[in-house]
Every structure is written in structure tokens, then in C-alpha cells.
């Protein structure tokens, strides 16, 4: 899967939102990033990890939540960054369901 394909999935979902500058309190024109594959540690089993596509960073300083896309399950999920490492904290399904779960 490519970054462009993932962006297409997100853009299709965002058609349902009347104002992408204020979706659940976030300006998505500022918080969405070019999908980037990154290493995520399993928050329950800190010995295992997988590579997932980061698509949104809640804060510019990377201290908040992130939203990722899992190309194997075709689902979006939440992660957090601590000590310069990303941790997967769960899949929520669609991009918007994940965003509303933050």
C-alpha cells in the first residue's frame, strides 16, 4: 500500500465532515501528515512491534496521540509517543471513529 492510497481513504471519509479545520477540536489541515511507516511497540507486550503508517499527530511537539493505519487489517488505530518510541494502544476501525476516540 502507498501513502497516496492511504490519503485517499482518509479524504473519502472526510467528505462527511463539514469543516475539516474543526473536526473534534482539531484542525486537520494542520494535524494530518503524509502517511509515514513507523515502528510501533505493542503496549501490552513490550517485546513485540510492527510497522504501521502514522497519518495524524495530535500536537506539533509529538507529545499527544497519533493515528495510524494498519495495512494488514485495513483499520485505523491510536498510538502514543513516549521516550521517542511509538506505542500501539488499539484499533478503532475507520479514521473518523479513531479520531473521535482520542
Per-range role (PLM):
Residues 71-102:
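A short, surface-exposed interaction/processing loop segment used at functional sites
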Amino acid at each position: 500500500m502507498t501513502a497516496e492510497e492511504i490519503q485517499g481513504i482518509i479524504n473519502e471519509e472526510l467528505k462527511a465532515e463539514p469543516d475539516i479545520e474543526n473536526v473534534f477540536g482539531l484542525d486537520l489541515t494542520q494535524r494530518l501528515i503524509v502517511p509515514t511507516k513507523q515502528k510501533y511497540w505493542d503496549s501490552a507486550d513490550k517485546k513485540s512491534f510492527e510497522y504501521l503508517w502514522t497519518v495524524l499527530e495530535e500536537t506539533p511537539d509529538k507529545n499527544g496521540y497519533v493515528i495510524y493505519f494498519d495495512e494488514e487489517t485495513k483499520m485505523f488505530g491510536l498510538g502514543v509517543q513516549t521516550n521517542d518510541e511509538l506505542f500501539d494502544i488499539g484499533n478503532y476501525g475507520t479514521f473518523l471513529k479513531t479520531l473521535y476516540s482520542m
